[in-house]
């Protein structure tokens, strides 16, 4: 082990690699399933593919760059900044994809009869494009000046050095904590989180309202209806919980860094917070895909067709979708 890498760093790198090895294949499988099953081509699954693409990029690009930044090689300031910005872009795209799916789930419960008329493929494509545009705007903002270059240049000049500063490439050396807290967290993370809380609270209210109506009207098999709606409710609660669990710790630590510079932050807490954010990408295929019957059947077919000698039977594209009853 190189002397510059601590035991905490080595453990962090190992966990990050493990997350990437789970995240990339899992999310590629989601995209693959949509490609091979025509029944998964509606607007709903476009948003799931958006999340899967973002999460593949997190595992394939963000995690390797995060490991590089954690090791801290000697680079020019702007080189380090270019390494840090893709991390911001792709993690932001995951957050916006989560929000898009939350809104989509709300519409499915709120207007089940008009859902397909409102959420058209064209509107879904516009929403997806908007997510990526916003992600690039948020993630590239440090490249346009909101960074730590001035402070680094002053320290560089004080040492009598000339030219562009050469630094040990670390995230906090190039990315301004004011940007991370005031702009990234207070504008682009916390509001989506609060909005999702409100959305899911409304969804729970609508489900409960529908349950009360349906229970009295469906005396034939109320347990079946209860089970279906309970599964939806549990999925929504899990989505919200995992989002908050994954993203809040790191941003809370950033707030501590900005508002209490003298406060000590144990390194292990920072590492745990970072891989929690990346780990959310590995969990998303389970939360968003494995709970949908059409995905489960398609995953099994992909496995049998490509990794076993015996091909799977054709996919029944008429499988009922796991949506609230119209």
Curated annotation (Swiss-Prot):
GO terms for cellular component: dendrite; plasma membrane; synapse. A lipid is attached at residue 309 (S-palmitoyl cysteine). GO terms for molecular function: G protein-coupled adenosine receptor activity. InterPro entries: Adeno_A1_rcpt (IPR001068), Adenosn_rcpt (IPR001634), GPCR_Rhodpsn (IPR000276), GPCR_Rhodpsn_7TM (IPR017452). It is a multi-pass membrane protein. SUPFAM superfamilies: Family A G protein-coupled receptor-like (SSF81321). The chain crosses the membrane at residues 11-33, 47-69, 81-102, 124-146, 177-201, 236-259, 268-292. Coiled coil: none annotated. Residues 34-46, 103-123, 202-235, 293-326 are cytoplasmic. The keyword Magnesium does not apply. Its main location: membrane. It is found in: Cell membrane. Residues 1-10, 70-80, 147-176, 260-267 are extracellular. Disulfide bonds join 80-169. Keywords: Cell membrane, Disulfide bond, G-protein coupled receptor, Glycoprotein, Lipoprotein, Membrane, Palmitate, Receptor, Transducer, Transmembrane, Transmembrane helix. Pfam families: 7tm_1 (PF00001). Belongs to the G-protein coupled receptor 1 family. Receptor for adenosine. The activity of this receptor is mediated by G proteins which inhibit adenylyl cyclase. PANTHER family: ADENOSINE RECEPTOR A1 (PTHR24246:SF1), OLFACTORY RECEPTOR AND ADENOSINE RECEPTOR (PTHR24246). This is Adenosine receptor A1. It comes from Pongo abelii. The gene is ADORA1.
